[in-house]
Amino acid sequence: MRSSIAFLSLALLLVAADAQAAVGSRVLVQDDGSLKINGRVVHLFGIYMPKDGRICDNSIRPIRCASRAASALRFRIRSVVYCENVSKNRDGSLNAVCLISSRGQIFEPKTDLAAYLLNEGLAVALPNAPFEYKTIERIARSQGRGFWGFFADSIN
């Protein structure tokens, strides 16, 4: 019983500390779809979003890929963003799994931002991505969401 109470107390302290750190963080979605949190650039782990200016082209309906993904992120992020660092890039930016809650409540189920973009068809799962990401991408592709809503000759 005591160990359960101690564990629960520790868990609540960790969640509160995490929430406090996240609440103080200002999140800015950059044009390339990366996040800027406390001055650091954070890329969503496991996905590729075509860089700004690149065209998803089917020769009939060209569309700027990155602007759609960045707009979707800006629309979706309305509360606290919780990021867990996975790796660091040579340029000092981070690759992280980032989650949000729709109403900003600590105990509410979180939405994975990378999974959200994959589900909307606005990103591609990388080879090192979790199996779930690859599955979400395949489903979005089969249902014609986002980039997959037309037969793309290329994503340049």
Predicted features along the sequence, with ranges:
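Bacterial N-terminal signal peptides
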Residues: 6-15
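Positively charged n-region of N-terminal signal peptides that target proteins for export
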Residues: 1-4
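Small beta-barrel nucleic-acid-binding modules, primarily SNase/OB-fold domains
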Residues: 18-156
